């Protein structure tokens, strides 16, 4: 049962967390270097 419920929790979590981390690091990178 854990094997079936774990991917269904992990997949949306990774799908939401990874882009959020990428966006945050990108915005921090841009703010630090003042590219804009």
From Swiss-Prot:
GO CC annotations on file: chloroplast thylakoid membrane; photosystem I
Bilayer-crossing regions: 4-24
UniProt keyword NAD, yes or no: no
Protein's cellular compartments: Plastid, Chloroplast thylakoid membrane
The family this protein is said to belong to: Belongs to the PsaI family.
HAMAP family per UniProt: PSI_PsaI
Protein known as: Photosystem I reaction center subunit VIII
Native organism: Piper cenocladum
């Amino acid at each position: 049962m854990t094997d079936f419920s774990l991917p269904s929790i992990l997949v949306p979590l990774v799908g939401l967390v990874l882009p959020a981390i990428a966006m945050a690091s990108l915005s921090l990178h841009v703010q630090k270097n003042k590219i804009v």
